[in-house]
């Protein structure tokens, strides 16, 4: 429940924010990746509930939806077609299949490979398709620089302050 999550400490007394709290705090200042992945309850109303919050806070131009589940991205496209969507891919055979072949047939504006599966060739290939590449989860400064040198559009990180510092100097 939300109440139980609010009791957790994520470090330094910080609590897990709701999406509404994130939008209230930094919604107009940053471009935010909103992940729509629900592994155990794939047929719940996650997408619809997130779309409601996005509309309420008028964040359509400030976000990107991403998910490992193409079905969720398809649902998001029907509800908010103007919001770009990125397909997340795992570091396994299924992820390779999605990255290599199936991605080209989906209605996605971006590919989100694990940083271990990101290389200069794949970045160029996806960019030639007119789509963007955002790699996850990149927390190492050297890896951030390498990805930037390859022309990646952005990174998904646990440390936005570090990424901002590294990418501004690159």
Question: Which residues make up each language-model segment?
Answer:
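Metal-dependent phosphodiesterase/phospholipase catalytic core, i.e.
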Residues: 1-90, 106-109, 113-115, 127-129
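C-terminal active-site rim and adjoining tail of enzyme catalytic domains
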Residues: 11-14, 21, 87-170
